């Protein structure tokens, strides 16, 4: 082989390899379901996760899927029968805001890996690369009916990195826990945390206006990066052979994924005015916020959230632990839910390894507070706050989050009404 041919071969290899990198999706889920049982659940009271309640209803499960729901379903000979008389059946609970795995138990510094607090923007880090697969908290969450959860980086940074949705089962690798085909998320944070962390070091951001500038600078960079990618991909094969593909940038890849609609934005934010600012920034750069997390003041802008299709992922009654968390009302979740004639999206989240064990009770507290405030909300609707709504916010509603024929049999049988 002549030197010129070697050079041509090498350049062609580099061009094709770089392009493949840009199109690759590393760390794919390798989840394999447990051996499936054939099960018929009979005579159950059901909250289906889509706002409906049924009595004396059967659920037929085969090959890990729901295959039939109805009254008096015939019992196939080789099916295990679970008599749910006096019991309740719901979809598996989903926690949209968890730090299990990245802050595992016991809580020691050597395995506390949720915040890469070395730069205000760390879009290049992925929470799944910090998760400890042996965290004993997973099993405790399972006793509370949690079948899937969404793990986020912490809130020290303006842009903290990618989140991941996982099945609640213990495996030896994180890829084998990852929920198949679930999109990545991007954790963003506004308010006190980023400006405190970096302001205390004498660097930006140290103010809320510094926060806003930091987001905007990052999105401007991401727009430029994405523009270069698009321009390169639109070139002819002959033109591509004459120049290098844009250099990979892990931080920009994540932000470009948001701009392309492939990565879902989950935004830590407490104050109503800051949530409104974040909505304005999202519109400036043409990306969508999927959910605001914590949102103690979400009730003030509930209609704005509904108008923009943004969920409020909220606590039932945790407030007052810092200044931006003071102005809370216990009907917060109910107000977000009932915005714009009931078109709002409310989610009860935990952010806590104890709270994740009791999300049904947290939802019950929120339901009671809403009723005291005068809202006529059914228990069947409140079940959406911990099932179908978080499933939608995690991008997995097509697979789980409600009891529908064809969906995964992520099912909880409760000894009593979960509320």
Regions picked out by a protein language model, each given a short descriptive name:
Residues 8-20:
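Bacterial N-terminal signal peptides
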Residues 30, 35, 105-106, 112-118, ...:
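His/Asp/Glu-enriched, well-ordered alpha-helical/loop segment
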């Amino acid at each position: 082989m002549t030197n010129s041919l070697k050079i041509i071969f090498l350049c062609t290899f580099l061009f094709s390899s770089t392009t493949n990198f840009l199109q690759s999706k590393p760390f794919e889920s390798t989840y394999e379901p447990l051996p499936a049982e054939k099960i018929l659940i009979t005579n159950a009271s059901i909250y289906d996760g889509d706002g409906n309640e049924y009595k004396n209803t059967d659920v037929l499960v085969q090959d890990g899927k729901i295959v039939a729901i109805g009254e008096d379903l015939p019992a196939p000979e080789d099916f295990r029968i679970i008599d749910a008389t006096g019991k309740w059946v719901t979809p598996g609970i989903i926690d949209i805001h968890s730090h299990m795995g990245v802050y595992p138990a016991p809580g020691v510094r050597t395995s506390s890996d949720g915040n890469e607090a070395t730069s205000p923007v760390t879009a290049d880090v992925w929470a799944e690369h910090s998760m400890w697969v042996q965290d004993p908290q997973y099993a405790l969450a399972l006793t509370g009916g949690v079948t899937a959860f969404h793990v986020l980086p912490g809130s020290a940074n303006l842009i903290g990195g990618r989140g991941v949705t996982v099945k609640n089962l213990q495996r030896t690798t994180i890829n084998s826990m990852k929920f198949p085909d679930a999109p990545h998320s991007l954790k963003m944070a506004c308010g006190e945390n980023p400006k405190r962390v970096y302001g205390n070091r004498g660097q930006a951001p140290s103010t809320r206006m510094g926060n806003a500038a930091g987001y905007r600078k990052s999105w401007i960079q991401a727009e430029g990066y994405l523009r270069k990618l698009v321009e390169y991909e639109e070139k002819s094969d002959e033109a591509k052979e004459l120049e290098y593909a844009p250099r990979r940038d892990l931080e920009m890849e994540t932000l470009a994924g948001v701009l392309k609609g492939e990565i879902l934005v989950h935004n830590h934010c407490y104050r109503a005015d800051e949530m409104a600012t974040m909505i304005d920034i999202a519109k400036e750069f043409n990306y969508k916020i999927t959910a605001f997390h914590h949102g103690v003041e979400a009730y003030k802008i509930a209609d704005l959230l509904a108008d923009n299709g943004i969920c409020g992922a909220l606590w039932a009654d945790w407030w007052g632990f810092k200044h931006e968390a003071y102005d809370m009302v216990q009907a917060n979740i109910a107000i977000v839910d009932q915005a714009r004639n009931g078109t709002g999206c409310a989610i009860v989240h935990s952010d806590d390894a104890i709270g994740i064990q009791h999300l049904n009770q947290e939802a019950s507290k929120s339901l009671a507070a809403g009723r005291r405030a005068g809202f006529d909300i059914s228990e069947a609707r409140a079940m959406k706050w911990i099932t179908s709504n978080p499933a939608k916010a995690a991008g997995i509603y097509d697979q789980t989050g409600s009891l529908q024929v064809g969906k995964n049999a992520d099912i909880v049988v409760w000894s009593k009404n979960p509320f």
